[in-house]
From Swiss-Prot:
Protein known as: UPF0597 protein BT_2080
GO MF term list: L-cysteine desulfhydrase activity
Family affiliation: Belongs to the UPF0597 family.
Lineage summary: Bacteria, Pseudomonadati, Bacteroidota, Bacteroidia, Bacteroidales
GO BP term (any one): L-cysteine catabolic process to pyruvate
Length: 429
């Protein structure tokens, strides 16, 4: 691999694997509000928020960090009151109990209007209009959770969409495939990719914090219980499940704990990281082996998300667990062909799992994905792979990946609409 291409891949990873506090969809909304409020230059009197269906879906039922509250209104209020856009996906890290009380008052005074943006094709779209007196400021995020495509005041446009479109085209020019991902992870100079260890540090700390409390459905904590050990054993496998689900428990409940995200999703970052970390640590792997396995996992996720898109009707845990299955397979001693077998097995098993928004029960889906990742790796190490005569699997692993992403980004669009319709029209539980 030539040095310029390697540098391009490293830049892509550093852009896609970043810290985040809280679920990235409501946090991205808070980020957009913060930018609009900063552009306005004063505390807004009114805030209008227009969202794509996928953003709305992922922000309805998830905890907001530091608030003990669920949903968009408090995220919007805090974005305006204490949010700082320079913090990116940690925009609410300065949140205090006093700020939460101010946010509640802001909501009670009916200063916030949130609605669905009609007639747009973007699945990730956030538009915020902040007003104070006769002054107005607008900010728009589209395509990526931190990608501003439009910023304006009454007087002038500060950022236009064309500038950002050029940047996105530059990213799109980097074409990945599984072989290139594998070769990059295994041959890059270690010091150039050592930064990926930050994912292990942050995401493991999130899991360990979750073990001390009661977050969400406490699935991770439950899996460490005496009864559960009688059923599943005190094994590497049970530890992989407990650590991964615990970090998800804490994040979905709104714990003020940073995690390292992947492609705009904290749960994807967790699922791509912790199974690999736990397997490596409990099998005595070296730091270099851990670094390369983590890089293989995270870059596989980024590669698949390139064609799937950041938000879709397909659960992102499917993609992220596919990455960790690759990392685990390699740590087991697998070669490229066996890593490809693991990917084929994952696609054959989990394609079609719906995304019905970010919420505490995502920990269940994360656990399903991760358990399948281990199973797929074990099959791959026995040279067992779902064949091209079965279902959507192709002889070429990259074509199988494209089949997965076509289903997730195109075929499941009607599913996405139905899921949102159900979520927005159901009665109280």
């Amino acid at each position: 691999m030539i040095e310029s291409e390697r540098k391009q891949i490293i830049d892509l990873i550093k852009k896609e694997v970043i810290p985040a506090i809280g679920c990235t969809e409501p946090i991205a909304v808070a980020l957009c509000v913060a930018k609009a409020a900063e552009t306005l230059g004063m505390k807004p009197e009114k805030i209008e928020v227009l969202l794509s269906a996928n953003i709305l879906k992922n922000a309805m039922g998830v905890g907001i960090p530091g608030t003990d509250m669920v949903g968009l209104p408090i995220a919007v209020a805090l974005g305006a009151l204490i949010g700082r856009s320079e913090y990116q996906l940690e925009v609410l890290r300065d949140c205090t109990p006093e700020a939460v009380e101010q946010g509640k008052l802001f909501i009670a005074e009916k200063r916030i209007c949130i609605s669905l943006k009609e007639d747009i094709t973007e699945k990730l779209y956030i538009e915020v209009i902040c007003t104070a007196g006769s002054q107005k400021a607008t900010a728009v995020i589209a395509g990526g959770h931190t990608t501003f495509v439009y910023i304006a005041t009454d007087e002038k446009v500060l950022l236009d969409k064309q500038q950002t479109a050029n940047e996105e085209e530059e990213d799109a020019s980097l074409e990945l495939n599984l072989r290139k991902v594998y070769d990059f992870a295994l041959t890059s100079p270690l010091d150039e990719i050592r930064f990926i260890l930050d994912t292990a540090r942050l995401n493991k700390a999130a899991a360990e914090q979750a073990f001390k409390g009661n977050y969400g459905h406490s699935l991770g904590k439950m899996l460490r219980g005496t009864y559960e050990h009688k059923v599943m054993g005190d094994s590497v496998f049970s530890h992989i499940l407990s650590y991964t689900s615990a970090a998800c428990d804490a994040r979905m409940a709104g714990a003020m704990i940073p995690v390292m995200s992947n492609s705009g999703s904290g749960n994807q970052g967790i699922s791509a990281t912790l199974p690999v970390v736990v397997f490596a640590e409990e099998n005595g792997k070296t730091e270099e082996e851990l670094i390369r396995a983590l890089m293989l996992s995270h870059l596989t996720v980024i590669y698949i998300k390139q064609s799937l898109g950041r938000l879709s009707a397909l659960c992102g845990c499917v993609v992220a667990a596919t990455g960790s299955s690759c990392g685990i397979t390699w740590l087991m001693g697998g070669n490229y062909n066996q890593v490809a077998f693991a990917v084929q097995n994952m696609i054959a098993n989990l394609t079609g799992m719906i995304c019905d928004g970010a919420k505490p029960s995502c920990a269940l889906k994360v656990t399903t994905g991760v358990s399948t990742a281990v199973l797929s790796a074990m099959m791959a190490m026995e040279d067992r792979c779902v064949t091209s005569v079965e279902g959507i699997i192709d002889e070429d692993v990259d074509q199988s990946i494209r089949n997965l992403t076509r289903i997730g980004s195109q075929a499941m669009n009607e599913t996405d609409k139905m899921v949102l319709d159900i979520m927005t029209h159901k009665g109280g539980c």
